[in-house]
Amino acid sequence: MAPRSLYLLAILLFSANLFAGVGFAAAADESASNVIVKGGKGKEREDGPEEPEETGPEETGPEETGPEETGPEETGPEETGPEETEPEPEPGAATLKSVALPFAVAAAALVAAF
């Protein structure tokens, strides 16, 4: 039977990795949203709040349009660009491997302690 200190160490490792995983998830989520709200107040942008531009009265006169020109219709196969691949993650960004690996180690330590 393992001593109590091993049980406590395993629980400590698991909870530390849990909080680290939450931190990784928050860091990954922060890049998606650049504006973090605190206390119900939004963070103002550096360029100031957006205000609609004032425009003068619009002139709505009759528009003269010429005969519509139709271009030659292409019946050949359309050229497609190279297939899009997933972009590489930013350096230091949280990935599934970087978050799941500490949990796996902590879970193995927890199982080994019991």
From Swiss-Prot:
Residues 93-114 form a propeptide. This is Procyclic form-specific polypeptide A-alpha. The gene is PARPA-ALPHA. It comes from the Eukaryota. It comes from Trypanosoma brucei brucei. Sequence repeats lie at residues 48-52, 56-60, 61-65, 66-70, 71-75, 76-80, 81-85. Keywords: Cell membrane, Glycoprotein, GPI-anchor, Lipoprotein, Membrane, Repeat, Signal. Residues 33-95 are annotated as: Disordered. Its main location: membrane. It is a lipid-anchor; GPI-anchor. A lipid is attached at G92 (GPI-anchor amidated glycine).
